[in-house]
Amino acid sequence: MNSFQKRIEEIYLERDRARGKQGTLLWFVEEVGELVRAIRRGERNNLEEEFADVYAWLATLASLHGLDLDAIGAKKYANGCPRCRATPCECPHPKPVV
């Protein structure tokens, strides 16, 4: 487990367990909404805070489900893109709409 997820557990795990998985999920979704708002509004000064909040709530959710974010991320992406196995990804993607 990475040090960030461990630190979030030290600070919040007991409180998050008491809130439960569903309640914690709602907080996570709210934080994702705040991040989306900051990105859409171009609020550069809020991005660090909102990214950190989303990362913390994601770490908490993983912990509540008994998952190690670092391990599952490394496992899924160890061989590059999970679909084409290339690094960088060589999957055909439509051009982004601007």
Ranges and model annotations:
Residues 1-51, 55-98:
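Flexible "arm" and connector segments at domain edges
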